[in-house]
Regions:
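N-terminal intrinsically disordered, cationic/polar leader segments
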Residues: 2-139
Length: 139
């Protein structure tokens, strides 16, 4: 038995606005400059906006910033300290929109988890489960 397949009527498929990125990049930084250590614990998400049509339609990834590159950028920028998470997200946004001319914007988010010192010890901590700071940057 043969089945005849008929082509659908002329249909135009249009690629709409899209974004992609790397979620939940865990960043834990211990600052050991003094005897009394400091800990910063973040969960960072990077979502990039731009014209990625060639990647979707032609398989051309020339204008795609790999998700591992996004993750490694988070780690690289944190190397010199994070500071306030809002400022850190601005650094991320400025980096991606400034270094890659096809990235027109994005959404960057961070959650900051806090740690309490154990018995006022210089470098022993327990996670504070009752407090999480969040920030979102959209460009």
């Amino acid at each position: 038995m043969t089945t005849e397949i008929t082509a659908p009527a002329d249909t135009k498929i249009v690629l709409g606005t899209n974004q992609y990125g790397k979620t939940e990049v865990r960043l834990v930084k211990i600052t050991r400059v003094t005897v009394r250590h400091q800990i910063q614990d973040l969960n960072v998400t990077s979502q990039l906006h731009g014209d990625f049509t060639a990647a979707h339609q032609d398989g051309d990834n020339g204008r795609v910033v790999a998700t591992d590159t996004q993750k490694n950028t988070v780690y690289g920028l944190a190397r010199n300290g994070v500071g306030a998470i809002e400022e850190f997200l601005v650094q991320l946004g400025e980096h991606f929109t400034g270094e890659f001319d096809w990235i027109t914007g994005g959404r960057w988010a961070a959650q900051q988890f806090f740690w309490d010192r154990i018995n006022d010890h210089d470098h022993a901590f327990s996670q504070n489960k009752s407090e999480v700071r969040t920030a979102v940057l959209e460009i």
